[in-house]
Amino acid sequence: MKFILIAIGGAFGALFRYFVSKVFNTHFPFNYIPLGTVIVNVLGAFLLSFVLFSSIERFEVNPNFVLFFGTGFLGAFTTFSTFAYETLSLFLTSPFRALVYFFANLFFGFFAAFFGMVLGRGKFL
């Protein structure tokens, strides 16, 4: 049963990642860095942090929901492999753009996770 929840969540997460990346890369073209990947990674960092900290400190969350949404959906929605590939790809043409992209993912991802933690816990640190 757990594998099915993760697989279904993963299928939805992968489809949603494709949709979000396509929308941001098509309708909000920002040719300096691949914005779609930054958006999905930052949004995923926020959501996972929010859900996990909420479930630990404020609400009783069904463990099956955490498997479906956290492991399945958000695991497939966020993408470290695409981030790594795009960073190296950018590095070949513009090392500076690669650094901007790399640090944008890290900075905004950690900021989003921190913000998700604060909102999930309902208190600052």
UniProtKB/Swiss-Prot annotation:
One of its GO terms (cellular component) is plasma membrane. The chain crosses the membrane at residues 3-23, 33-53, 65-85, 99-119. It is found in: Cell inner membrane. InterPro entries: FluC (IPR003691). It is a multi-pass membrane protein. One of its GO terms (biological process) is cellular detoxification of fluoride. PANTHER family: FLUORIDE EXPORT PROTEIN 1-RELATED, FLUORIDE-SPECIFIC ION CHANNEL FLUC. Fluoride-specific ion channel. Important for reducing fluoride concentration in the cell, thus reducing its toxicity. This is Fluoride-specific ion channel FluC. It comes from Thermosipho melanesiensis (strain DSM 12029 / CIP 104789 / BI429). The gene is fluC.
